[in-house]
């Protein structure tokens, strides 16, 4: 499942984070690329204590977003970083590493930190058997997708694009199982909102928790 959520992190929090970033702490993104991806990676990454503090605040906000948690069902965060693409910078087609810091990567995500008015280009493009799909993420918007896709970031043609990217090991390894659980959970919540703790709500809750119990990797 590929899902975009608008305003996953509130604008005030994102603006505060961005205002505190020191341009001097950005370094060549090739340093963290895999051996093949180094040839196609042309961006910058934030390093140092400010990076750790900023990413932790943003992760905390994402953990408070019920819809984000329902999509990812995170078990462990493998890696997270803030990157920057300035005019002419890009990240060519590549595959994310299957393991990072000894953690399996099931889900990749990008959280936009720049308003769309701050840059042009910089689309995140995901490739699959049906072709390509692209996204431009605004400030606070998140895109979550299974890590098994080839993807790229198109060149920024104007301005500067800031984003936080991360990789997560999910409690539910299989992406089709995660999508089923997401659909069931949204359905049982809709049933509760409409009819309270009805018989249908109880049945859906039973199905949801028994499937989660069956499929969880704990």
Curated annotation (Swiss-Prot):
This is PKHD-type hydroxylase IL0759. One of its GO terms (biological process) is intracellular iron ion homeostasis. Fe cation binds at residues 94, 96, 151. The lineage of its organism: Bacteria, Pseudomonadati, Pseudomonadota, Gammaproteobacteria, Alteromonadales. InterPro entries: Oxoglu/Fe-dep_dioxygenase_dom, PKHD_C, PKHD_hydroxylase, Pro_4_hyd_alph, Pro_4_hyd_alph_FE2OG_OXY. Residues 76-170 form the Fe2OG dioxygenase domain. It comes from Idiomarina loihiensis (strain ATCC BAA-735 / DSM 15497 / L2-TR). It is an enzyme of class 1 (oxidoreductase). HAMAP family: Hydroxyl_YbiX.
